[in-house]
Swiss-Prot record:
Calcium-binding protein. The keyword Cytoplasm applies. It comes from Schistosoma japonicum. It is found in: Cytoplasm. Residues 3-38, 40-69, 70-105, 106-140 form the EF-hand domain. The keyword RNA-binding does not apply. Pfam families: EF-hand_7. GO terms for cellular component: cytoplasm. Ca(2+) 2 binds at D53, D55, N57, T59, E64. Keywords: Calcium, Cytoplasm, Metal-binding, Repeat. It comes from the Eukaryota. This is Sorcin. SMART domains: EFh.
Length: 171
């Protein structure tokens, strides 16, 4: 859904509860739902605000909000593509298919580990946790690639060992 600038300005002003001209992670969290009727995970919201906070002041202004809004829409489209049963969450099989389509060929054991790390004991991953899982995986992949000069998926340790260790630290 493409929205015009005036509509987005209206959304921005509604989310900007304190009328400061910028949106904090807490303000953004209260305005977004994960598709299961609960607010987005604050860690996901903080991650997204940090990604789009170009002036590094801890909040996003309207121009930064435009990028974040498109980013969330793109992730919603992706999420809906893999939520085949329209349950509002992605089960293990749907999550595995999404990761494969992103080019990740991980063992079933590792996909299970990711599922357990991001499902909040629900057995499925809601929209916000899907974003968080995918952005973490992309960030860690980018970091790993800096050291995997030959692009073979191994350095001093395997990719999955690196991810396992990193997930234990960041989650």
């Amino acid at each position: 859904m493409v929205m015009d600038t005036n509509s987005l300005r209206h959304i921005f002003s509604r989310v900007d509860a304190d009328k400061s001209g910028s949106i904090s992670a807490n303000e953004l969290q209260t305005s977004l739902s994960n598709g299961l009727g609960t607010p987005l995970n604050i860690r996901t919201v903080q991650l997204m605000v940090a990604m789009f906070d170009r002036d590094m002041n801890g909040t996003i202004n309207f121009n930064e909000f435009l990028g974040l809004f498109k980013y969330v829409q793109d992730w919603q489209t992706c999420f809906r593509r893999y939520d085949r049963d329209n349950s509002g969450s992605i089960d293990l099989n749907e999550f595995s298919n999404a990761l494969i389509s992103f080019g990740y060929h991980l063992s079933p054991q590792f996909v299970n580990l990711m599922m357990r790390r991001f499902d909040r004991n629900r057995g499925s991953i809601a929209f916000d946790d899907f974003i968080y899982a995918c952005v973490c995986l992309q960030t860690l992949t980018r970091e790993f690639s800096r050291y995997d000069c030959r692009g073979i998926g191994h350095t001093v340790f395997s990719f999955e060992q690196f991810l396992t260790s990193a997930f234990a630290v960041i989650i």
